[in-house]
């Protein structure tokens, strides 16, 4: 199997990233794993997608640091590959990372991924599905039963009324963004500072005002979903809990949250079942659900991370489960002579 990974920038990849772990799992099973940045893609006069890509030497990697050193260093194979010749292309770049410094790069993976998809490459997650999820408004397309009450606006008065209706406690965050950046917890005693919070967020666009869930004090759970089902391998769920530190309401790891073992309950599995039809419809192969209590806080479809954290607590290499699924998809395409739409193949 020839698999490609599109990332923001090869040289900023880290050994703990899920993309790095997936590439190692693929190489260790004898597959070709090519990595390319969003700036490395091209559409040539031959009407094919090409990319300046890197591949680490084929060997049995036991160290992620060694793999990444090989990939980013002189030992790597550096070639201008034909992306159309790949079996699978995984879009693992995070558009929000490029929003300010490289706005042109936000849609690059999706744009080139669509062409590769039309040329017969299995592109995951489905680029047309990803285009619907370019901001957090996508979350509002899922049933209201699984979401906190939400207002999305730039109007300060509307936000104040909404917060008041919620009893003075709410969460404010930007419509576009990730990593826990620009997230505020508004409490009744914060009323004098509410205008300042709103002004800070409206400078960058729309604001999401959201019901605060008291269970958030215990942190949230990241549960992976693959092919529309909870990712389970060797009897273990790919999940972990993120616990906030001190008075910081954000449990996101990038914002200083700590990781703990997660216990997956029937409530969590029911949430997956409720959102499954939409994820399947949009061709979302690998997704991270962020759960607080009996509600979803976020559905992460762009480069969801944390498989390594789940492995730490469950002692199971979930990356192998993902590669297993990719191998099956490639086999299906061969058996049926590529007689499947990408969105169908994404969750088979």
PLM regions: where:
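Extreme N-terminal starter segment of soluble prokaryotic enzymes
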Residues: 1-4
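ATP-dependent carboxylate activation and anion-phosphoryl transfer catalytic cores
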Residues: 6-7, 263-348
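Rossmann-like NAD(P)H-binding beta-loop-alpha module
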Residues: 144-167
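Anion (oxyanion) recognition and catalysis
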Residues: 27-28, 116-117, 164, 280
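Short glycine-enriched loops at secondary-structure junctions
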Residues: 127-131, 243, 292-295
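Conserved N-proximal alpha/beta basic substrate-recognition cap immediately N-terminal to
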Residues: 11-25, 34-149
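A short linear hydrophobic-aromatic micro-motif
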Residues: 170-172, 207-210, 283-288
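Phosphate-binding site of ATP-dependent enzymes
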Residues: 18-19, 156-157, 166-168, 179-269, ...
């Amino acid at each position: 199997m020839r698999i490609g990974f599109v990332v923001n920038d090869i040289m900023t990849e880290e050994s703990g990233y899920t993309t790095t772990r997936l590439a190692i799992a693929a190489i260790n099973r004898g597959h070709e794993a090519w990595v390319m940045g969003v700036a490395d893609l091209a559409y040539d006069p031959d009407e094919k997608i090409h990319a300046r890509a890197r591949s680490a030497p084929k060997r049995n990697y036991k160290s992620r640091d060694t793999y990444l050193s090989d990939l980013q260093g002189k030992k790597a194979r550096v070639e201008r590959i034909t992306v159309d010749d790949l079996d699978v292309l995984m879009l693992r770049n995070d558009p929000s990372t490029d929003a300010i410094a490289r706005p042109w790069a936000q849609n690059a993976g999706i744009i080139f991924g669509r062409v590769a998809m039309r040329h017969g490459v299995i592109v995951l997650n489905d680029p047309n599905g990803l285009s619907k999820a370019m901001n957090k408004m996508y979350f509002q397309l899922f049933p209201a039963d699984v979401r906190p009450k939400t207002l999305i606006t730039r109007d300060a008065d509307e936000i104040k009324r909404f917060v008041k209706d919620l009893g003075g406690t709410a969460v404010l965050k930007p419509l576009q963004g990730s990593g826990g950046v620009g997230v505020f917890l508004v409490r009744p005693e914060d009323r004098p500072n509410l205008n300042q919070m709103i002004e800070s967020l409206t400078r960058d666009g729309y604001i999401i005002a959201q019901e605060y869930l008291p269970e958030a004090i215990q942190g949230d759970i990241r549960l992976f979903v693959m092919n529309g089902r909870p990712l389970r391998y060797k009897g273990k769920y790919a999940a972990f809990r993120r616990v906030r530190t001190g008075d910081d309401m954000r449990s996101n790891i990038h914002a200083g949250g700590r990781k703990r073992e997660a216990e997956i309950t029937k409530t969590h599995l029911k949430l997956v079942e409720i959102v499954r039809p939409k994820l399947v419809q949009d061709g979302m192969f690998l997704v991270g659900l962020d759960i607080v209590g009996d509600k979803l806080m976020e559905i992460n479809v762009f480069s969801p991370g944390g498989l390594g954290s789940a492995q730490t607590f469950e002692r199971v290499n979930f990356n192998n489960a993902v590669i297993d699924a990719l191998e099956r998809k490639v086999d299906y395409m061969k058996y049926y002579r590529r007689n499947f739409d990408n969105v169908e193949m994404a969750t088979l």
